[in-house]
């Protein structure tokens, strides 16, 4: 949860979750 994936998750889930990103504070992060 430290590397921003350049995607927000305010209205929809992280599409980048397929590469390991998850929602945190309305922004998608990985690791």
Swiss-Prot record:
Disulfide bonds: 5-21, 9-23, 14-28
Record keyword Acetylation present: no
PTM note: This is a cyclic peptide.
Alphabetical UniProt keywords: Disulfide bond, Knottin, Plant defense
Tissue: Expressed in fruit, pedicel, root and stem but not in leaf (at protein level).
GO term, biological process aspect, one: defense response
Lipid metabolism recorded as keyword: no
UniProt crosslink position (Cyclopeptide (Gly-Asn)): 1-31
Family classification: Belongs to the cyclotide family. Bracelet subfamily.
Function per UniProt: Probably participates in a plant defense mechanism.
Domain commentary: The presence of a 'disulfide through disulfide knot' structurally defines this protein as a knottin.
Protein name per its UniProtKB record: Chassatide C6
Species this chain originates from: Chassalia chartacea
């Amino acid at each position: 949860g430290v590397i921003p994936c350049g995607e927000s998750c305010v209205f929809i889930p992280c599409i980048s979750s397929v590469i390991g990103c998850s929602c945190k504070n309305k922004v998608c992060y990985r690791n």
